[in-house]
């Protein structure tokens, strides 16, 4: 691991994670290049901001669960290769029910150069401290559909409220939201705004 990067769980007490791209449970249907361990990595600045967000979430009865942080460029390249393969239907219903693979890039759900590769972006959700269950958000991680947008109008009231909780927590701790994905947040003051890293997560 390079320079000012760290495993988030080593710096943020109590945070939970499930690194989706290190598992078979993601839109490609298999572990992604560069994810050799089920851990979340980020810059130390990201970790500090997540620590503040975790404390704010706890005040509201929630905890944070991370799905992704730093993403090696080789993983993004893997996404691009996957998008060019024939459709096999294995993950389509769950992750991109109304578009084709190539459209993920056109519609802004996946990018050839990802902010994740700069080390200051996270995919995350809330869970209830009392039960440990994930908060309902009206759609899962990497559901590439308008229902995942922040301005989606068909999200049930309780789920929409949970999205607002997450957004307010993250905004208060220096993060910017992404219009197309309720789970995606980037630290406004990125340490490496123009650098895309490629070291593996191991």
UniProtKB/Swiss-Prot annotation:
The lineage of its organism: Bacteria, Bacillati, Actinomycetota, Actinomycetes, Kitasatosporales. The gene is vanX. This is D-alanyl-D-alanine dipeptidase. It comes from Streptomyces coelicolor (strain ATCC BAA-471 / A3(2) / M145). Pfam families: Peptidase_M15. NCBIfam families: dipept_VanX (NF033115). GO terms for biological process: cell wall organization; proteolysis; response to antibiotic. One of its GO terms (molecular function) is zinc ion binding. InterPro entries: A_A_dipeptidase, Hedgehog_sig/DD-Pept_Zn-bd_sf. HAMAP family: A_A_dipeptidase. Binds 1 zinc ion per subunit. SUPFAM superfamilies: Hedgehog/DD-peptidase (SSF55166). It is an enzyme of class 3 (hydrolase).
